[in-house]
Amino acid sequence: MTTPRRTTPREWMNRLEATLEAFDETGGHRVLSQVFDELGVEDALSHVVLPYLHEVGERWSTGSIGVAQEHVASNVLRSRLSVLMGAGERPEGPLAVLACMPGEHHEFGLMATSIVLSRLGWRTCYLGANTPTAELAMTCRTLRPAAVVVAAHRATAFAANAPALRRVAKSTTIHLAAPGATADVAELCHASRLDGDPVRGARTLHEDLGVPRSLIDESTAV
């Protein structure tokens, strides 16, 4: 018997485009359910969801789609990712605080990092887009997290807030994420970098901080 051909990431992305950019939210949710069922959460995020969202932004910036289409696609994806956030958290797991820098509204990559960390047994406090550094610092003083992940698409956003990030780094480990996380700005902020794909970045953080083996073993069975 011939093994059925698997749908490629490109084909999944085309299906999302055909539904969401035609304002078919129900169809878009159906495609997303199929994507996650076939690929699993992490591969779906890395190979379909995040690349598709990047393409949506590119098409909006070139005028290929309108604001309404971009909003529908973004809102459907945000609602689906929000459902996944927190799944798998363990009461004894380490805590991560996640936030975008002031002025940064691109949060989907950070949401993906939060999802993967929670699936690895972490507890997460997700502050989201455009978080003032004073609020980030207050949250860290209150919760005393094992790690802080901050995201920005421009290195200047990190550099402008470097003094505040250095103060936070005195009591916890800070990890810079997204394209703005250059080596130079990480050094300036007394932080490390989560280089590359948000899913891989979450796994790197998980492994580098020496999470107890029991959590790693149980999380991989999810």
What do these predicted ranges mean?
Residues 31, 139-142, 204, 208:
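CheY-like receiver
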Residues 1-88:
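Long amphipathic alpha-helical segments
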Residues 97, 175, 192-194:
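Hydrophobic/aromatic beta-strand patches that form the interior of the parallel beta-sheet core
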Residues 179-222:
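Peripheral docking tails and interdomain loops at the edges
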